[in-house]
Amino acid sequence: MEIIEENQRGINIYKLNGHLDSNTSLGFENKLIQAIDDGSKSMIIDFKNLDYISSAGLRVILKATKALKREDGKIMLCDMQDYVKEVFEISGFDSLLPIVGSMGDALDAFSPNRGPYGK
């Protein structure tokens, strides 16, 4: 899996390409937890080019979400392909995690008084 990292407006953005599974989840988990440990409180994970996610991948997303919440941070998930979105729906994670349709919607959610998950 390829991970493209960006930072916009102080928000760490992770664009995933390929498969997030048992072979790739540990590296991604370490990257997210390290960013949180380094003080990041705002993250977006872009699933636009992610072709596959396993239960190991779901666990990484949930673990990062919980770690951010402990630090009063926020994570947004965006731009999921139908298959990936279906995995989140079947697992029930879609009701636990903030998922929006586009990167623009995810960025807007971090603006004061904007977006469905804005503070």
Task: Pin down the residues of each PLM region.
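Flexible, glycine-rich phosphate/dinucleotide-binding loops
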Residues: N12, V84, A106
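Amphipathic alpha-helical interaction surfaces in cytosolic regulatory modules
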Residues: L20-L97
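Active-site donor-binding loop signature of nucleotide-sugar glycosyltransferases
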Residues: L16-G18, S102
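Short beta-strand/loop segment at the start of cytosolic alpha/beta domains
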Residues: M1-K15
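A charged, well-structured terminal subsegment
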Residues: S102-K119
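General small-molecule cofactor/ligand-binding pocket signal
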Residues: I4, C78, V100
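A short, terminal or domain-edge coil/loop segment
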Residues: M1, S95-L107
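Conserved catalytic submotifs in the C-terminal HATPase_c
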Residues: Q8-R9, K48, G104
